[in-house]
UniProtKB/Swiss-Prot annotation:
Pfam family, one: Pkinase
Family: Belongs to the protein kinase superfamily. AGC Ser/Thr protein kinase family. PDPK1 subfamily.
Residue positions where Phosphoserine is found in the record: S25, S244, S396, S397, S399, S401, S413, S504, S532
Molecular functions (GO terms): 3-phosphoinositide-dependent protein kinase activity; ATP binding; insulin receptor binding; phospholipase activator activity; phospholipase binding; protein kinase binding; protein serine kinase activity; protein serine/threonine kinase activity
EC number: 2.7.11.1
Occurrences of domain PH (ranges): 462-553
Native organism: Rattus norvegicus (Rat)
Higher taxonomy: Eukaryota, Metazoa, Chordata, Craniata, Vertebrata
Protein name: 3-phosphoinositide-dependent protein kinase 1
PTM notes: Phosphorylation on Ser-244 in the activation loop is required for full activity. PDPK1 itself can autophosphorylate Ser-244, leading to its own activation. Autophosphorylation is inhibited by the apoptotic C-terminus cleavage product of PKN2. Tyr-9 phosphorylation is critical for stabilization of both PDPK1 and the PDPK1/SRC complex via HSP90-mediated protection of PDPK1 degradation. Angiotensin II stimulates the tyrosine phosphorylation of PDPK1 in vascular smooth muscle in a calcium- and SRC-dependent manner. Phosphorylated on Tyr-9, Tyr-376 and Tyr-379 by INSR in response to insulin.
Entry remark concerning the domains of this protein: The PH domain plays a pivotal role in the localization and nuclear import of PDPK1 and is also essential for its homodimerization. The PIF-pocket is a small lobe in the catalytic domain required by the enzyme for the binding to the hydrophobic motif of its substrates. It is an allosteric regulatory site that can accommodate small compounds acting as allosteric inhibitors.
Protein kinase domain: residues covered: 85-345
Subcellular location: Cytoplasm; Nucleus; Cell membrane; Cell junction, Focal adhesion
Keyword Calcium: no
Length: 559
């Protein structure tokens, strides 16, 4: 039988001791001394208790003298309504909720408003999830957590007014720059440790800590979110049973897999996974499916790549311990004092982390072989250069602001004159061919080039093997620059198309040294190494194709 709107309010009650105010003031809770009403009370009957709006329902007449003189009571704030806000872009979408940026018309304050469909919540049995998230967030008052300012509702939806973390998910930056340098890794790990110390001190286990659930505010400090699977421990309990799987495969603790229980130490396991990912660019436990990931977790089967920071490695090894009572930071190991005293945090001042200026996000790109050079890239600088196609010059970079020299005009229809073979598996084309010559080149490619099958019948303009890096890991790929334009990369051993670097007007190549070059895109920087030492030729050809695609003439100035 379908529930009424009022029954849904009762199905998602605020705890009897705390009711959320419906205004974004510094203090977000107020006392509620009367017990909540029974779910069985019909919607038309007056009752005293708390509602999803964060206000109390009208009580029946009382002999209490304060209630006989309403003028002596403080005025109740008006309930917020959807029309009080101007809703903007979607910030995120979940299985039963959507988070939208909204500006309150009366104050011009921005919030991330989480909108939940009542019907869908009931149908999918997600009422406990919603209740848990709201109740946990109402207990938190710390700068490293997303803040719940207010709740309200209409006939069809629930609305949670949350603090707006303008810089989005931490995962976005890991994907963008690959690996954090040691300074960035240390600072953001320290903020997560500080947040967990507070959370566990409140008797709360997050149970789904991962980079997607760690947001960054306008000042680039962390704000942890998503408490739908969190657990509030009773005073005499140290762990929580899980009747079903909670968490995300790559970060789930072994005790949840083997004992179906989670404890505060389970969050410390996730912390170890996150530190590893900040440095290496990928989580420690990776496989083709969740079952294989779980097998690796319960066997503690993972490896550190070369050039992993030694002190960070020692910290990860002390967190990724199968016995939950042996993890650094857990109660059995004397709590957070020894964790914060680890040598990796030697330079951290813990008292005022949220007031410190976060370090600039800087990529860590150690040399992969003895004859390579280390590369460091400042993420803010990369962002500021997206509007400019010109490749920056530096002491270790080749200036590629223009094509080196105009190629001579060709005559006749001998298409071989356009092809420059670099070795048996690499070549590039001059781009001065006619449409008829292009057709002949494409026929030649289709008939004899083994990589033609991967390029959707586009003419290959340059190709060759590269080492494609993701964090501290590198994979050999065949890079194929084609008309379109497209940049495909193929697994040369298994002959499988692995992906494509997305083209846009913001795409920008950058040579760092003879072997290493970057391809910057708005959402990610691709780190590539040409083993033949011709990184500058890749950048020159990519830029030449960019000019043909986005500029009216090849000689137009770079904007």
């Amino acid at each position: 039988m379908a529930r009424t709107t009022s029954q849904l309010y009762d199905a998602v009650p605020i705890q009897s001791s705390v009711v959320l105010c419906s205004c974004p003031s510094p203090s977000m809770v107020r006392s509620q001394t009367e017990p909540s009403s029974s779910p069985g009370i019909p919607s038309g009957v007056s009752r005293q208790g708390s509602t999803m709006d964060g206000t109390t329902a009208e009580a029946r007449p009382s002999t209490n003298p304060l209630q006989q003189h309403p003028a002596q009571l403080p005025p109740q704030p008006r309930k917020k309504r959807p029309e009080d806000f101007k809703f903007g872009k979607i910030l995120g979408e979940g299985s039963f909720s959507t988070v939208v940026l909204a500006r309150e018309l009366a104050t011009s304050r921005e919030y991330a408003i989480k909108i939940l469909e009542k019907r869908h919540i009931i149908k999918e049995n997600k009422v406990p999830y919603v209740t848990r998230e709201r109740d946990v967030m109402s207990r938190l008052d710390h700068p490293f957590f997303v803040k719940l300012y207010f709740t309200f509702q209409d006939d069809e939806k629930l609305y949670f007014g949350l603090s707006y973390a303008k810089n989005g998910e931490l995962l976005k930056y890991i994907r963008k720059i690959g690996s954090f340098d040691e300074t960035c890794t240390r600072f953001y790990t320290a903020e997560i440790v500080s947040a967990l110390e507070y959370l566990h001190g409140k008797g709360i286990i997050h149970r789904d800590l991962k980079p997607e659930n760690i947001l960054l505010n306008e000042d680039m400090h962390i704000q942890i979110t998503d408490f739908g699977t969190a657990k509030v421990l009773s005073p005499d309990s140290k762990q929580a049973r899980a009747n079903s799987f909670v968490g995300t495969a790559q970060y789930v603790s072994p005790e949840l897999l083997t004992e179906k229980s989670a404890c505060k130490s389970s969050d410390l396991w996730a912390l170890g996974c996150i530190i590893y990912q900040l440095v290496a660019g990928l989580p420690p436990f990776r496989a083709g499916n969740e079952y294989l990931i779980f097998q690796k977790i319960i066997k503690l089967e993972y490896d550190f790549p070369e050039k992993f920071f030694p002190k960070a490695r020692d910290l990860v090894e002390k967190l990724l311990v199968l016995d939950a009572t042996k993890r650094l930071g857990c109660e059995e190991m004397e709590g957070y004092g020894p964790l914060k005293a680890h040598p990796f945090f030697e330079s951290i001042t813990w008292e005022n982390l949220h007031q410190q200026t976060p370090p600039k996000l800087t990529a860590y790109l150690p040399a992969m072989s003895e004859d390579d050079e280390d590369c460091y890239g400042n993420y803010d600088n990369l962002l500021s250069q997206f509007g400019c196609m010109q490749v920056s010059s530096s002491s270790s970079s080749h200036s590629l602001s223009a094509v080196d020299a105009s190629l001579p005009q060709r005559s006749g229809s001998n298409i071989e004159q356009y092809i420059h073979d670099l070795d048996t598996n690499s070549f590039e084309l001059d781009l001065q061919f006619s449409e008829d010559e292009k057709r002949l080149l494409l026929e030649k490619q289709a008939g004899g080039n083994p990589w033609h099958q991967f390029v959707e019948n586009n003419l290959i303009l340059k190709m060759g093997p590269v080492d494609k890096r993701k964090g501290l890991f590198a994979r050999r790929r065949q890079l194929l620059l084609t008309e379109g334009p497209h940049l495909y990369y193929v697994d040369p051993v298994n002959k499988v198309l692995k992906g494509e670097i997305p083209w846009s007007q913001e795409l920008r190549p950058e040579a760092k040294n003879f072997k290493t070059f970057f391809v910057h895109t708005p959402n990610r920087t691709y780190y590539l190494m040409d083993p033949s030492g011709n990184a500058h030729k890749w950048c020159r050809k990519i830029q030449e194709v960019w000019r043909q695609q986005y500029q009216s003439s090849p000689d137009a100035a770079v904007q």
